[in-house]
């Protein structure tokens, strides 16, 4: 049975764009883990590409190709409905965005670990019981 990891959009975008920690993110793909995310990742990933296009980092056609490639990635996408209440509780308890809390709620539900490149989110949950469901991107085995 493959080890399951929930990845956020900040990790997934590093599969396609050379950024800090891209090597760590790519290891997730190369080792063929069971990669999962809430369906929100598709919108967040597209928005990251849109922002980079607006900033002039690359053309829209390139972003479209990256988005197409992402949609073919070995990422198992889950609907939100079953994790909404848990995500809300996480967001309120830890004062984190509902968006980020959806990823953590999925990790908890799937008995997986969430891999994040969002330092602020990771640090906010350090020292809490939720930390056992988190991996900082540099901790990827």
Where are these regions (language model features)?
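Residue-level signal for well-ordered alpha-helical positions
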Residues: 19, 28, 48, 90, ...
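Phosphate- and divalent-cation-binding pockets in alpha/beta enzyme and binding domains
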Residues: 24, 44, 86, 123-124
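Acidic, PIN/NYN-like endoribonuclease modules and their adjacent C-terminal/linker elements
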Residues: 1-4, 104-141
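Active-site neighborhoods of divalent-metal-dependent phosphate/nucleic-acid chemistry enzymes
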Residues: 75-117
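Active-site-proximal, substrate-binding regions of enzyme catalytic domains
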Residues: 46-78, 86
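Short, conserved alpha-helical segments within structured domains
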Residues: 41-42, 62, 83, 103
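Short, well-structured N-terminal submotif of metal-dependent ribonuclease cores
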Residues: 1-41, 52-65, 120
